[in-house]
Amino acid sequence: MAYKIVVDSGHGGEDPGAVYPGRQEKEDTLRLALEVGRLLEAGGQDVVYTRTTDVYQTPFEKAQIANREEADYFISIHRNSSPRQNQYQGVETLIYDKSGIKLKMAEAINGALEEVGFRNLGVKERPGLVVLRRTNMPALLVEAGFINNDQDNQLFDEKFTEIAGAISEAILGTLCLLYTSD
């Protein structure tokens, strides 16, 4: 069964997101979101992108895109940042609350990224985030490593294909479990 999945690239346009010498979150997220989306499409899913170029949309606009498309799932790709360089490392996935399919999918994504080599910082509730609160479908925000951590950046660059594969396979695996349990 094909699901409609909105894949969102965090930030964009005049909003670079977190920055670190030589990189901007908006660029890393766009590159990763496009590859995750491509892999989801190859897995038979219907993918809608919030952006495919360097443009800015408010979080409200991103949620509206997903709602207008009547998507089944919303996946937002981001990079994390900490107050000090190399202070933290790892991946975490944010969800509105720890319930339902979004929790299973978030845990699967984090576990798959841990296998690639990231530290698993767990699944966190963030009910105040617009893209998690204003979407009418299960929504996740994946923080794919810290942009101001040298080890996370090395992993992001050297294992980019594996990272995109891990995220997409975790999503597809969760959807497969859901479909077979119906």
Show where each model-derived region lies.
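Catalytic-core environment of secreted peptidases
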Residues: 2-20, 75
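Active-site-proximal helix/loop segments of hydrolytic enzymes
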Residues: 3-4, 27-181
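Glycine- and acidic-residue-enriched helix-capping/strand-helix junction motifs
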Residues: 17-31
